[in-house]
Amino acid sequence: MKNKSIFGLLVNPFTRIAGWQAFGLGLVFVALMGFIGASSGIAFDGVFDMHMFEITVQQAFIYLAIDLASLVLVMWVTGLIVSKNFRFIDLLGTMTLAKAPFLLLAIMGYFTTAPNMNAIMRDPYVIFHSTSFVIMMILTLPVMVWSITLMVNALKISCGLKGSTLTVAFIVGLFVSEIIAKILIHYVV
């Protein structure tokens, strides 16, 4: 029974934490992602993606700020359209905390050696020569699924959505926020 409750909290902590508490805890994770990502060569340059390249701490935090602002503002507008009653702070807190799983990828950057980009262009199979890079690619999928699950639950709990309304609102909101983040990152950084 205890394992079920721990798993439940890992995929939906928002039944226990939301608002300012979730926002504060989420900011701790985001700050760690920024510092660790910058030093390990992991850039979170989109709402739900990351790439391996050298960045400064300042760039890391600009990327994260744009990502988070895009996600929260688009989901807020989405909430205004499809929900009758919700608090912005709950959405802000839960969406910020939903980024937490990406900290695992930032940490994994310390142990990953990315193949040279020129070598990849000549022979794409060179990526399989780096075991750590292959492990990183494999780890990325469950981390992204976990984070997206948290985002869905954040929208569900914060805005009181369910069913097809939740599904459509989330998918549209996520893709719009990713597009906005990519455009802003391209022009700002």
Regions inferred by a protein language model and the residue ranges of each:
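Juxtamembrane loop-helix boundary motifs flanking transmembrane segments in multi-pass membrane proteins
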Residues: 2-6, 45, 49-57, 83, ...
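Membrane-interface helix-boundary motifs at transmembrane edges
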Residues: 14-17, 80-91, 156-164
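Selective recognition of hydrophobic, aromatic-rich stretches within alpha-helical transmembrane segments
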Residues: 56-74, 110-159, 163-164, 171
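Central hydrophobic cores of alpha-helical transmembrane segments
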Residues: 94-95, 165-176
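Juxtamembrane boundary at the C-terminal end of a transmembrane helix
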Residues: 178-189
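Hydrophobic alpha-helical transmembrane segments of multi-pass integral membrane proteins
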Residues: 24-36, 66-74, 103, 147
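Alpha-helical transmembrane segments with an aromatic anchor "belt"
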Residues: 51-113
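N-terminal juxtamembrane cytosolic/stromal segments of multi-pass membrane proteins
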Residues: 1-51
